[in-house]
């Protein structure tokens, strides 16, 4: 069975926060932020908007593109580190909002690599024959766990959600290879402290990311007997432009073949890859039969990469 992505969707809060806005609350400026992160603005959800609200809207878009009803979904997986509350899961909340009465539902926690973990979990469930259609969502309200007095981290993060419907696709299409990994020895480099604020060792995370993203990309390509020259489009975790560019240059992939939503969206953790993917699809940057690589890394430390042939 060939299993791939039938539809994508993403949602952004309407509240735009520019670098100039951040100058008013921390000691920073637009040039400092842009040169170090590539970010010009990010979207922040208002207090009354929950992670589940953003996940719901992204899911609607993915269902519409897949031409499926909510009742057609057998399982909902939501990757998030910012659920509304510890429980119930965001997946259960949007199951009700969507009217997906036939779906099981659970959240996945693998930080910025969460969508990759969710996507491969969806594939494995479908491979068994137990389920036919799985909705995978990455959704984050990072603004609620950001320390707005820490200029090294508060400039990075934004809120939003991205979604994909996974199911059977045509011959030669869909997910062709994948890699998932973790190294718990690096847990202290990126974590949520007891004050519910993100703590990051930027230097160590950078060193890890610029090594792991290219290595994982090469691994999933070589599993197919192909080379990096065969990649039509790369969708990396939108962490930081310096990390993304360093990884791209190591891979020798041209700039026009890499998704860059970070300038407008910021770093959206587990939502960043599905948001960037959905935007690229909507803008026509990804075409039928393209070989796509999705690759990300996150706290844990965790990482994941997926190679897929685009199309239904």
UniProtKB/Swiss-Prot annotation:
It catalyses: malonyl-[ACP] + acetyl-CoA + H(+) = 3-oxobutanoyl-[ACP] + CO2 + CoA. It is an enzyme of class 2 (transferase). Signal peptide: none annotated. GO terms for molecular function: 3-oxoacyl-[acyl-carrier-protein] synthase activity; beta-ketoacyl-acyl-carrier-protein synthase III activity. One of its GO terms (biological process) is fatty acid biosynthetic process. The active site is at 112, 237, 267. InterPro entries: ACP_syn_III_C, ACP_syn_III_N, FabH, Thiolase-like. Transmembrane segments: none annotated. Residues 238-242 are annotated as: ACP-binding. The keyword Transferase applies. Pathway: Lipid metabolism; fatty acid biosynthesis. GO terms for cellular component: cytoplasm. Keywords: Acyltransferase, Cytoplasm, Fatty acid biosynthesis, Fatty acid metabolism, Lipid biosynthesis, Lipid metabolism, Multifunctional enzyme, Transferase. SUPFAM superfamilies: Thiolase-like. PANTHER family: 3-OXOACYL-[ACYL-CARRIER-PROTEIN] SYNTHASE, BETA-KETOACYL-[ACYL-CARRIER-PROTEIN] SYNTHASE III, CHLOROPLASTIC. Catalyzes the condensation reaction of fatty acid synthesis by the addition to an acyl acceptor of two carbons from malonyl-ACP. Catalyzes the first condensation reaction which initiates fatty acid synthesis and may therefore play a role in governing the total rate of fatty acid production. Possesses both acetoacetyl-ACP synthase and acetyl transacylase activities. Its substrate specificity determines the biosynthesis of branched-chain and/or straight-chain of fatty acids. HAMAP family: FabH. The last Arg residue of the ACP-binding site is essential for the weak association between ACP/AcpP and FabH. Homodimer. Belongs to the thiolase-like superfamily. FabH family. This is Beta-ketoacyl-[acyl-carrier-protein] synthase III. The lineage of its organism: Bacteria, Bacillati, Bacillota, Bacilli, Bacillales.
């Amino acid at each position: 069975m060939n299993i791939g992505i039938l539809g994508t969707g993403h949602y952004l809060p309407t509240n735009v926060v520019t670098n100039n806005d951040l100058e008013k609350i921390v000691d920073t400026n637009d040039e400092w932020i842009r040169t170090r992160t590539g970010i010009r603005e990010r979207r922040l959800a208002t207090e009354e908007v929950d992670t589940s609200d953003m996940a719901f809207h992204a899911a609607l878009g993915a269902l519409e593109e897949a031409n499926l009803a909510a009742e057609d979904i057998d399982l909902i997986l939501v990757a998030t580190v910012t659920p509304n509350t510890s429980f119930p899961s965001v997946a259960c909340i949007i199951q009700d909002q969507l009217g997906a009465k036939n779906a099981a539902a659970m959240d996945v926690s693998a930080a910025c690599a969460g969508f990759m973990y969710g996507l491969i979990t969806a594939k494995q469930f479908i491979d068994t024959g137990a389920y036919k259609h799985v909705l995978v969502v990455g959704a984050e309200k990072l603004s609620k766990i950001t320390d707005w007095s820490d200029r090294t981290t508060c400039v990075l993060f934004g809120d939003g959600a991205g979604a994909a419907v996974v199911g059977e696709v045509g011959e030669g299409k869909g997910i062709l290879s994948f890699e998932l990994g973790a190294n718990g020895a690096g847990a202290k480099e990126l974590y949520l402290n007891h004050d519910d604020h993100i703590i990051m060792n930027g230097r160590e995370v950078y060193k890890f990311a610029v090594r792991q993203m290219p290595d994982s990309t090469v691994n999933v390509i070589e599993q197919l007997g192909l080379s990096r020259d065969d990649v039509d489009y790369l969708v990396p975790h939108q962490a930081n432009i310096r990390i993304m560019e360093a990884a791209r240059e190591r891979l020798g992939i041209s700039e026009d073949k890499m998704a860059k939503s970070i300038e407008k969206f910021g770093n959206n953790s587990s939502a960043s890859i599905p948001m960037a993917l959905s935007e690229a699809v909507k803008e026509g940057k990804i075409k039928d039969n393209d070989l796509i690589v999705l690759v990300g890394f996150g706290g844990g430390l965790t990482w994941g990469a997926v190679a897929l042939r685009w199309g239904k």
